[in-house]
Amino acid sequence: MIPLTHGLILAAILFVLGLTGLVIRRNLLFMLISLEIMINAAALAFVVAGSYWGQADGQIMYILAISLAAAEASIGLALLLQLHRRRQNLNIDSVSELRG
């Protein structure tokens, strides 16, 4: 079993990497992937904390986070597919130019 601090540090590093990718990248697909990394980092923190205290609540929260991430990814990919069909571009700047 890894110590609590090591697991939380790993989760924080993953969260910061996802946040950095979300802020820096202009492609919507990479932004969606960065958001998934952030969700998984938060879920990892739940699992590590639950394992440290010997509770199954962390694993239950992980299952909830994974199901929410799957729903978010499916809706996000459907929107990205429609945007790519209409604009032939996944740049975030093209979304801000939408009319109507």
From Swiss-Prot:
Q: What is its EC number?
A: 7.1.1.-
Cellular compartments annotated: Cell inner membrane
Q: What class of enzyme is it?
A: translocase
GO:BP terms for this protein?
A: ATP synthesis coupled electron transport
Bilayer-crossing residues are 4-24, 28-48, 60-80
Question: Membrane topology type, per the record?
Answer: Multi-pass membrane protein
Q: Which reaction does it catalyse?
A: a quinone + NADH + 5 H(+)(in) = a quinol + NAD(+) + 4 H(+)(out)
Subunit composition and interactions: NDH-1 is composed of 13 different subunits. Subunits NuoA, H, J, K, L, M, N constitute the membrane sector of the complex.
Instruction: Give the similarity note.
Output: Belongs to the complex I subunit 4L family.
Q: What is this protein called?
A: NADH-quinone oxidoreductase subunit K
Organism expressing this protein natively = Klebsiella pneumoniae subsp. pneumoniae (strain ATCC 700721 / MGH 78578)
What's the source species' lineage?
A: Bacteria, Pseudomonadati, Pseudomonadota, Gammaproteobacteria, Enterobacterales
